[in-house]
Amino acid sequence: MALSGHVLIDPARLPRDTGPELMWAPSLRNSLRVSPEALELAEREAERARSERWDRCAQVLKNRLLRVELDGIMRDHLARAEEIRQDLDAVVAFSDGLESMQVRSPSTGGRSAPAPPSPSPAQPFTRLTGNAQYAVSISPTDPPLMVAGSLAQTLLGNLYGNINQWVPSFGPWYRTMSANAMQRRVFPKQLRGNLNFTNSVSLKLMTEVVAVLEGTTQDFFSDVRHLPDLQAALILSVAYLLLQGGSSHQQRPLPASREELLELGPESLEKIIADLKAKSPGGNFMILTSGNKEARQSIAPLNRQAAYPPGTFADNKIYNLFVGAGLLPTTAALNVPGAAGRDRDLVYRIANQIFGEDVPPFSSHQWNLRVGLAALEALMLVYTLCETANLAEAATRRLHLSSLLPQAMQRRKPAMASAGMPGAYPVQTLFRHGELFRFIWAHYVRPTVAADPQASISSLFPGLVLLALELKLMDGQAPSHYAINLTGQKFDTLFEIINQKLLFHDPAAMLAARTQLRLAFEDGVGVALGRPSPMLAAREILERQFSASDDYDRLYFLTLGYLASPVAPS
């Protein structure tokens, strides 16, 4: 291609507002040569660069997918290894028990050694190692149950052994929850079992849901200064019992172990309930009444402080009862030189004697104060629901252990009858004031805490968590205006915890979801205790959502979190 030089045009011949222009014209003297080899080389280099970039992107994607797959495989291996370790611990504990039985009761005269008496939960116990088996009783009308871990999780594993003949149904709430989970776009596929599309719920989904409920009040900060909420509540209640005994607490020794602390639990709780009725302190049963949004985003004090802002618990009835009795001395009193200031703090003395010096005074490090108050309110609600009960079998009863565990129950009754154990013959079904709660405390709470000293209120009573969450949703609605919720938003927090655990693994999002669930539980317990009749409000929800029709059903629901009934598979 040829181009010419520039041509100058005379401006005089152009209009006034037109300037000179440079024009180009073709010329044979100007040419542009293009090398085919250079074009081919440039094309090859560009193709190679594109290929290398694509390979790098593909390799990065493969590495990420491989990392996710290896993470899943490692989690599965760790879970299987943990199950094997728990089984080995159970075998070791069982063999140790057999050896100790042979040492204590050797056979003589060719006769077999007499069977050792079954341990009584009311007697002092020692901590069980690993995931060892232990016996619990929920109702005096039923035989004891051997469990490993939690009662709710252990029983779940026994409900799916014969799904060809029958499957467990858990009531309207779980049926709605399962249907809502199957409709969500983001949900772990390993929880989408075939039973979720029938009248039942798959074992994996039930296991995860119950695990979330049991972990509602468990401490997730791993701070050595933090106590389990049950232990913090017991320290507060027992200290109040000793303090209100006047000078008698000076002669009565302080509890020196967790066993002694647990032994005083029912008595101290009854003392607090009686004084709340007699003294009527101001306030309500809500842990947090402040409208500050930041205060509801974290359970721990804000800005890494040890104490909450002044007036945080000023509207709580139990806190006002303790302050009025002088149970919680001020920080100024604790800072008095010498030991006299700390000696006046009965709560600190009990905590220091049982748990050591790692636990600071409740008045200065208020995490234990907060979780203790919340756990006390939860125990008060359990006590109220079990205050008077009739465990006689009703025609509308939903839970029947003889239907869920037919073979085990048939084998158990003759053995119990020959040994003279409770449950093999007619027992008491009507209980006086607080009598049933003391039975549950002695035969369920104490053995469970012996097996797991870190047991929390939610792990002991997962059904109480569900009840409180439902009461929180109904707060502010008149009984005649209860609307049918079609949105499924009440399951959002529950499913968010499951998604973070199995899919996303975001610590910040998991912390926010667990905090939201715990605050909702605390609010629900406060709403229930604030009702004129907590028993009537609880009965309505338990019957409508979980098909609990009598005191027996309600008792088992509190400790299990579900009521199973066998139905034909569809």
UniProtKB/Swiss-Prot annotation:
It is found in: Virion; Host nucleus. Its main location: virion. InterPro entries: Herpes_UL25. Keywords: Capsid protein, Host nucleus, Host-virus interaction, Viral genome packaging, Viral penetration into host nucleus, Viral release from host cell, Virion, Virus entry into host cell. One of its GO terms (biological process) is symbiont entry into host cell. Belongs to the herpesviridae CVC2 protein family. Heterodimerizes with CVC1. Interacts with major capsid protein/MCP and triplex capsid protein 1/TRX1 at the pentamer vertices. Interacts with the large tegument protein/LTP. This is Capsid vertex component 2. It comes from Epstein-Barr virus (strain B95-8). The gene is CVC2.
